[in-house]
From Swiss-Prot:
Organism this protein belongs to: Chlorobium chlorochromatii (strain CaD3)
Name this protein carries in UniProt: UPF0235 protein Cag_0319
Domain of life: Bacteria
HAMAP family assigned: UPF0235 (MF_00634)
Similarity comment text for this entry: Belongs to the UPF0235 family.
SUPFAM superfamilies: YggU-like
Amino acid sequence: MVELQEKNGSVCIAVRAQPRSSKSMVSGEWNGALKVHLQSPPVDDAANEECCRLLARLFQVPPSRVHLVAGHSSRNKRVMVEGVSAAMATELLQPFLHT
């Protein structure tokens, strides 16, 4: 199960990023983190910005409400999504998780 922490009307999600992929998409779970494939290379923050845009589309919020809080230079990241509860996040992630 993907690690989610709810705090002050936001949810913090563990993310495992794979930059330089052929297609940007959510591909499931990896060791308790949401696995995302990103077309952008990990140069000049391009992959981090693409990760936030991808998650904003997934959670149906504006990109300004998605923030990278940890893992700026790592594949393992923590992303905060404002205005989304843990229950709502779990529901939106369900199609991507193989249980």
